[in-house]
Amino acid sequence: MSSGSFATFCVRTANPVAEENPHHARVEVRSVAGDPVGLENTGFDGMVFRAGESYRFSMWARSVSGDAMPVRVALADDDGEPLADAELSVAGESWAKYETTLSVPFPTAADDEPTDGEARGIVSTQGTLRVLFREAGVVDVDFVSCEPMTAYKGLEHFRPDLVRALDELHPRFMRFPGGCITHGLGLDNMYRWERTIGPVEHRPHNFNVWGYHQSFRIGFYEYFRLCETISAKPLPVLPAGVSCQNTSQGPVPIADEDMPGYIDSVIGLIDFCNADPETNAWAAKRAAMGHPEPFGLEYLGIGNEDRIDPVFEDRFRRIYDAVRAAHPEITIVGTVGPDPSGRDYDEGWRIARELRIPIVDEHSYRSPSWWFHHLDHYDHADRNGSRIYLGEYGSRDTRLVNGLAEAAVMGRMEANGDVVTMASYAPLFCKNGHNSWDPDLIYFDNERAYRTYNYWVQRMFATTTADTAWPVAVDGGILFRRELPRTVGLSVTGGASADLADIVVTTDTGERVELPDIAYRGNGPVTTGLALEADSYTVDMTVTYHEGMWGVQVHTGDVNGPDHNVASFGRSFELQLVREGCGSTLAGTEVSMDMVRPGTVWHARIHVADRGADMALEIDGQPIVAGREVADEPRRTVSVARDSAGGVTYLRVVNAMADPVSVDLSQVLDALDVPVSSRAAATATVLTADDPYAGVHGEEAPTRPVERPCELMSGMYEAPAWSFTVIAVG
């Protein structure tokens, strides 16, 4: 605002554009001397503007007096200098939508400037959108929008580079809108699909359980359009009539009297996707949004990681029965809780068997060590029961070793394709600086997308899909045994508040160390400075719990290194192994839905033996949980897949060890009758790096897959250290 100009600003709710989102801005411009006054927005972490790009601007506005109000809309660069502007005139006392186009010129004229918005040069990374008023008057403003007009395959409202990164994975399906945001933080926060379609102004904003704001500019209609654009079958997930249990209020069910209306909403989604607009009101809404053709919905998820209790079972059964009766052609995907074991898992599978649910959604976030130890997890699945959809999985980091672990387990899932019918990595996208969960498959900032090692592994499978697969028994040095450190330290982390007193560490040689009390207030790692060496030891302490639902974690062993141990106190007791910087549960009790009472006291003893391979926990002198780590991890795997239609055989080789290894594939090639000519012309796509711990959250993977000739006349293939290889023969 220049000297002599004067204006005021306030937020109002009276007479809004949309009652669903009533808050809007009122700007009272008293006087303008020199430069105009107005509103500006720097976006999320600044706005990136690109040379040669055009931006679609829109806003709703009204002149309170009814007199015409001249408005200048401008894009400004990092220094506040204008890049593009346009003039509008707001006239009339009623709300109206005003639109214009803002075009950022190229610095110099050229005939060969790029036309792909992803390739255009960035001229501003901390840009600003300005709505400027040039005369005195009073104006109301709402729903201001500014989007680049470049679209990937014509898909509006999505960043082209992000959609491209997703499309290049060649996904067969996409699950949305996510996990815990589906059932929400209480009933008012439960994701209601029908509130995310239609005019965007009438989609009520909300928050989600991860703390993000949801404007629903991307709603269910846009998700279906995204799936259509990338040729992925949609898999929408709706709440099972119960909110998320991982909150202070626990799971809250939809009231019994409201369930018929909710079931109608679930069936309405199927109609919105598939019904005829001429005969169905929901389908007419789809047509009104510009898509009279059906979306061809085949799958519908009901529930996400829910607490499987009698209330959940009642709500789920009612939804399931109603959908099956109304739309038997829809394949319903059920849920069996957040982990691949435990009470919810067992109860979820019981319900699946009783109802004969076609597919159940399992979730599993585990360390690379856990995955390598459990490559046979699906070998023993019931072939006569529900099919398995591994709907959320990952290995808790973006390093190469994590990608290799995921490649190994994906090979085994592929070999168990008769029962593991679907799988999807999660989470998918994360904006740098705004992460509530790591790792993610694709990170991005305002300028570009970053593909992780996990991404490249997914892509190597997605571009070599097959219809038949077999595991291969591998002889020789496939086992990895970890050398655990003798270091004994102690630190505390967690999200709760607790006092830890009377802390005594006693080693197997009789050395005894008393540590100062710790008043922990959820304030990040608190270290004690303990530095001993021992193979076995005990830790005694008195834990007084004050508040917090996520517990307090006591780390022991080499707490500053990648391999140590954790004992967790809270709504459950849990022992964890941290290996290569990633943790997984060794043993634990069921998580209680009740909060820990403030002032609860536990007299705890943690037993650690064999340098952390063996753990046990006592509370008040009673054994609670215990477990022992299996020493050997299968770190070298081979699997075979066949694309019958394409006539191509894929040999997948994982070598997650520090030395290259020669793999004799001759028996496999002979068994598949691969001709000599095909063996001579094979190609290998190899993902590898010297450092297994290369790869950082939020950054591009340091290396990416490389394709090269692979002559297999002898049947021998040398797999590089720390590598995943897909050999194509055909």
Residue locations for each model-derived region?
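Extracellular glycan-recognition regions
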Residues: 478-633
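An acidic-aromatic substrate-binding cleft motif
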Residues: 122-217, 224-233
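Carbohydrate-binding surface patches
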Residues: 87, 634-676, 684, 725
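Acidic, Ser/Thr/Pro-rich beta/coil linker or hinge segments at domain junctions
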Residues: 674-719
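Extended acidic/polar, glycine-enriched regions
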Residues: 35-37, 44-168
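Catalytic-core region of carbohydrate-active enzymes that cleave or remodel glycosidic bonds
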Residues: 226, 321-324, 328-331, 349-354, ...
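Extra-cytoplasmic beta-strand recognition segments
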Residues: 1, 25-27, 39-71, 96-103, ...
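Aromatic- and acidic-residue-enriched carbohydrate-binding clefts of CAZyme catalytic domains
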Residues: 9-24, 182-220, 247-264, 271, ...
